[in-house]
Structure formats: C-alpha cells, structure tokens
C-alpha cells in the first residue's frame, strides 16, 4: 500500500501553539516501524492549475506570495511562511496522488487500480474556495475530487460515464468548506458525520449531514454511520470514495466532545473500507483532525486506521492477481 507524506516540511509555529504538528512524523515513524507492506512516498506539490479547480486564483496567489491579510492568517490558525505555503500544496498533492493510485489513473493513462491509498495528513475540509480556516489552507479532497473527474473524462470520454465522487467525512467537525465548494455540484456527494455543538458554529449544508450529541459513544455512532451509508447508497453511485478518517471523535480528544473508544473508531474505519470494498469502489483516505490530550493516543487511532486500510488494500491486491 502506498502512503504519501509531507511531515518533513515543518511549520515554524509559535511556542505553545495548540496544533499538534508532531503527530504526522510520529505516525510515519510508527507505520514504518510496526507495519510491513506500506511504501512511503514523498508528497508532490499541487500546481496552481490543480488548486484552481477548487480555489480562487487570488486566494492561491495570496498564499503563494505571502500577501494574505493578518486577519485571514488568524482565521486559518497558522502564521504565513514559505513552509506553510509549500506544506499546504504538498498536503493537496498527497491526496491527489493517493486518489490517482486508488483509481488507477497514471500520468500516462490507465494503470492497475490499487483500490486503497493514503495521505498521511490532509483532510483540510474547513478551507473554502476563497479562504482558509480551522488549520486548513487548501481543501485537498475538493481539489482531488475535481482533478480525478477531469483526468477520468480525458481518459474515458467516449467509453465510460463521468466519474462521481463521494466524500465521506468522519472528522468530528463538519466539513463546511467542502460542503460550500460542492453545494451546486451533483457529481460529488458530501457526507459529514460530526458533533452538533462543535466547530464550525455556523455550518454549511452538505448533501447529507449527521449531527451527533456531545458524549456520543460507540454504539450510537455506529448506528448513525450505518444509516448514513444506507442513505448514501440510496441517493448516489460513486466511482471513487475520499474518506476523512478523523481521530478527533476519540474519547481522549480535547476538541472532540464525543466518546468513541479505540475499538469504536476501528469499527468505524472498517465499516467505511468494507462498504467501499463490497461495491468495488476505490478509496483514498486522509487523516484529518486529531487533538488528543495525549498525542500518542491520536497517533494510535491513526495507526489503527492504517492497519484496517492495509487489510483492504490486500483484498484489492489479491483481486488484481486473480
């Protein structure tokens, strides 16, 4: 299984900043140390043209050239720096590359579908077309969805229907930027399962929003997820799934307000991967949020996601051999 990383582009954050930047390197180290069969690849940087599939040119230029207003930097939560701009491009590029591998779209045409591939960061779902927010600069899943649709159309214009993409966002915070970008796009289905009383406090309308009460535990969460997947299946037929596997519904997360256990989050991940596998839908996933009081707990949740993902990548690999 291929996984794309960009943790070597470290943001120069002020002392005491609440974003746990170290989690990305910690996760990569544990995957390398504890798993075999995962190939680590450096994330490519998304180009201006790729970013423009989901973002306004003026906003892209402001991030690139450091002309972003101080108020906009505060809304994002990161001070501007060259490293911030580069890392944001790499985070998008990682999800694009993972989606391309999962779907089997190579730079020179069709390649064998991997079925499952990973971005070891990403899930920057609070970024709108014209602005960032909530530690999100560019919206990686929005760019990836649009770019995969464009590449699919170029390759299969006269032989297959257009590519439809389902974004399954299980970060504890609503994917407001993603919902806004695809508000009038029937070819992309946005599903968000999130805390009702959590950030963002002014939410957008996804194609399907599932709001959960504070303190929601494993059983209630899984019931809600099952209903959501049934509704997705009833309303939409995706050819690609982009999965935001947020670690922040975990009971030890300081920003999450839900009470899922390790077992509950592993069951959540398994249900999503299995849902896609049973329908033979390629899936690219990213890590999204995770703000554990103990950073090692966040990393453990994410490592468990990788272990489940690898099981389903193996199923795809076996099918490809046969």
What residue ranges belong to the model's regions?
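Charged, often glycine-rich, active-site loop that binds/positions anionic groups
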Residues: 46-68
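Acidic carboxylate-rich catalytic motifs and surrounding loops in phosphoryl-/glycosyl-chemistry enzymes
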Residues: 38-48, 284-293
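A general "terminal functional-core" signal
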Residues: 70-322
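Short, flexible active-site-adjacent loop segments at beta-strand->alpha-helix junctions, enriched
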Residues: 7-9, 57, 123-124, 194
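Hydrophobic residues in alpha-helical segments
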Residues: 31, 54, 63-64, 99-109
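N-terminal low-complexity, Ser/Thr- and acidic-residue-enriched intrinsically disordered segments
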Residues: 1-46
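Glycine-/proline-rich flexible loop or hinge segments
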Residues: 8-13, 45-49, 71-84
């Amino acid at each position: 299984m291929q996984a794309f990383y960009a943790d070597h582009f470290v943001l120069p954050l002020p002392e005491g900043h609440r974003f746990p930047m170290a989690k990305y390197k910690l996760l990569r180290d544990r995957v390398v140390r504890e798993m075999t069969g995962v190939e680590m690849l450096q994330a490519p940087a998304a180009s201006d043209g790729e970013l423009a599939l989901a973002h306004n040119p003026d906003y892209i230029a402001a991030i690139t050239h450091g002309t972003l207003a101080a108020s906009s930097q505060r809304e994002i939560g990161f001070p501007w720096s060259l490293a911030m701009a580069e890392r944001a491009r790499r985070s998008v590029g990682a999800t694009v590359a993972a989606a391309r591998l999962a779907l089997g779209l190579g730079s020179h045409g069709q390649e064998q579908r991997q079925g499952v591939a990973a971005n070891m960061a990403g899930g920057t779902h609070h970024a709108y077309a014209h602005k960032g927010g909530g530690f999100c600069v560019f919206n990686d899943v929005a760019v990836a969805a649009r770019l995969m649709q464009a590449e699919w159309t170029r390759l299969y214009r006269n032989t297959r229907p257009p590519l439809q993409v389902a974004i399954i966002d299980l970060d504890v915070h609503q994917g407001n930027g993603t919902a806004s970008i695809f508000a009038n796009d029937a070819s992309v289905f946005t599903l968000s399962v999130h805390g009702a009383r959590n950030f963002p406090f002014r939410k957008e309308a996804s194609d399907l929003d599932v709001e959960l009460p504070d303190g929601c535990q494993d059983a209630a969460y899984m019931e809600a997820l099952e209903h959501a997947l049934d509704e997705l299946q009833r309303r939409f037929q995706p050819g690609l799934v982009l999965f935001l596997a947020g670690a922040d519904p975990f009971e030890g997360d300081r920003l999450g307000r839900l009470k899922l256990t390790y077992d509950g989050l592993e069951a959540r991940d398994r249900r999503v991967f299995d849902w896609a596998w049973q329908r033979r839908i390629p899936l690219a996933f990213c890590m999204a949020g995770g703000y554990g009081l103990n950073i090692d707990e966040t990393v453990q949740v994410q490592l468990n996601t990788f272990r489940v993902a690898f099981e389903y990548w193996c199923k795809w690999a076996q099918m490809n051999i046969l």
